[in-house]
Amino acid sequence: MFQTFISRHNSNFFSDKLVLTSVTPASSAPVLQTPKATSSTLYFDSLTVNAGNGGFLHCIQMDTSVNAANQVVSVGADIAFDADPKFFACLVRFESSSVPTTLPTAYDVYPLNGRHDGGYYTVKDCVTIDVLPRTPGNNVYVGFMVWSNFTATKCRGLVSLNQVIKEIICLQPLK
C-alpha cells in the first residue's frame, strides 16, 4: 500500500561513472561495481556486453538498522542497447557475508513495471523488500538485473537505486 504514494524516484545528484568497459553475461550475473550503502546511481556510456546467456547487475547494500523488517526500494533506469535484445529486467534480493562480485545461487526476484521500446528500456518503480537477513551475519543486497541471451552489443544508460528510509507523513486539511 505504501508504494502507491511514492510519486517519483529521487536519484542522487551525482552519479558514479562505470569504470568497467565490458561485461560477459553469466548465470551468476557479475556485479558491475562494488555495492554502496542505501543509494547509488551508476552511469555507463559505452559498456560492451559480450555474447552470452545470462545477466549482469548493479546493487546496493541495504541498511538493516532501521526499525522495520520491510523497506521500499525505488529504482529508476534508462538503458539502451545498440542491438535490440529481448531481455528481462528485475530487482533481485540476496544475502552475502562478504562484498558480492556475482549473484549467488539463492536470490528473490521482484518484477518491475518497465517499458521496452526497440533497444531502449525505461523503468521507474518501487518494491517492498525484506531487509532483515535470513541468515545471521549476512548483509542484504538489492540489485537491478538485466538478463538475456545476449549477442555482442554496446550498452549505455543510467541505473539508480535508493532505499527509502524516511517516511513522509502528509497531513490532510481538517474539514
UniProtKB/Swiss-Prot annotation:
Which positions make up the signal peptide? none
Tell me what this protein is called: Major spike protein G
Principal place where this protein is found?
virion
Q: Give yes or no: UniProt keyword Nucleotide-binding.
A: no
Any one of the GO CC terms: viral capsid
Similarity-based family: Belongs to the microvirus G protein family.
What job does this protein perform? Attaches the circulating virion to the bacterial lipopolysaccharides which serve as receptor for the virus. Determines the phage host-range. Probably triggers with protein H the injection of the phage DNA into the host cytoplasm upon conformational changes induced by the interaction with host lipopolysaccharides.
SUPFAM superfamilies per the UniProt record, alphabetical? ssDNA viruses
For this UniProt record, the keywords arranged alphabetically read as follows: Capsid protein, Host cytoplasm, Host-virus interaction, Viral attachment to host cell, Viral genome ejection through host cell envelope, Viral penetration into host cytoplasm, Virion, Virus entry into host cell
- A Pfam family (short name) is Phage_G
Phylogenetic lineage: Viruses, Monodnaviria, Sangervirae, Phixviricota, Malgrandaviricetes
Its GO biological process annotations read: symbiont entry into host cell; symbiont-mediated perturbation of host process; virion attachment to host cell
Q: What InterPro entries does the database record attribute to this sequence?
A: Capsid/spike_ssDNA_virus, Spike_G, Viral_coat
